[in-house]
Amino acid sequence: MASKFTIHVKSSYEELWRYNIVLVCELCNAKGERIDYLAEESFIAAVGSNLEVPPVDYSVDRTLRIATKEGDYINILVYVVPHTLPSTNDIVKTKPFSLVVKVENDKKESLVNQVFKINQWSGDNITLEKVGVTK
């Protein structure tokens, strides 16, 4: 059944400034055809920048949000790309951090509320397919 979708991507990790984040959403109809394509990006620095501290204008709240028009389901991609390596080379001190992806439909029903563990060294690519398809 057709619905509008809202996607939120966020993390409370204090060194999230070391990463660029891209949220991509493909809105599809019941036939599987793309009817819209949306993207939101939180870009801090070019890959390889190796910043010592966060940029002066860095905002701690880096929630990415996309609201779609009406469609039958969505496919979601989230890219977490490190531009600056962790502050230490100690593997024990650089455990994965949490990134939360939430999706609601226009009835405010939760379709996804998932925590992903992101490797501090490599970042991650998250794929969620056919969100909103009723079984």
Task: For every predicted segment, state its role.
Residues M1-V24:
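Short, extreme N-terminal segment that most often corresponds to the first beta-strand
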Residues R18-V24, N89-V100:
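Short coil-to-beta strand junction motifs in C2/discoidin
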Residues V60-I66, G123-V133:
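Exposed aromatic-hydrophobic patches
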Residues G32-V78:
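Short, intrinsically disordered low-complexity segments
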Residues N113-N125:
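Short, solvent-exposed aromatic-acidic interface loops
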Residues N29-A39, K107-Q114:
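Surface-exposed loop/edge segments in extracytoplasmic proteins
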Residues K10-E14, V80-I91:
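Short amphipathic, basic-aromatic surface patches that mediate peripheral association
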Residues P82, N113-Q114, E129:
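Extracellular or exported targeting regions of proteins
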